[in-house]
Amino acid sequence: TAAAHGVAIVPFGLGSGVCGGIEPQSSQLLLDMGQMNTLLALDEENLLATFEAGMNGLEAEQAVAAHGLTIGHWPQSIGISSVGGWVSTRASGQFSTAYGNIEDMIYSLQVVLPNGELVTLGKAPRAASGPDLRHLLMGAEGTLGVITQVTLSLRRAAPCRRYSAYYAADMAQGFNAQRQIVQADWKPPVMRQY
């Protein structure tokens, strides 16, 4: 195994990262996850979808959208990032106001640990059952294991979308309007100010 020889494995999703993680040192092994790109299971009753970690994010969203569902995770890199990459970087998306961040969507993870063991880390009933080990992998960028499968909680797709733009005289007025919207408990998926 790589661990027995002291060789670090660097998982590579679709290469949308900007932190230099795709440049392994000569003593490291780059593991291209790009061929692990399949929707493995779609449970429309329980609103769950299991993807291989290398699946393109936009293709994952399109696959569930064909069934009237949504992941609800729309990072700006959605078309060039992978589902496993979202978890590995603890990504946030443009619709996080409405749907949450990636950690809010993860139902379970399948991971290969550094010793080669394949484990599944899933949700457990809320109780004093110990730490939720999924959170160790979220944002770890492959340092604690290689994510091979991700099961995400889905939502029913909105029956319609409405887009609106408004003018504010200055930034302060715009921020005040956004604050009032949030404090009124409205949950627009996206709010931007330019």
Protein language model features and the residues they cover:
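Glycine-rich N-terminal segment of FAD-binding domains in flavoprotein oxidoreductases
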Residues: 1-36
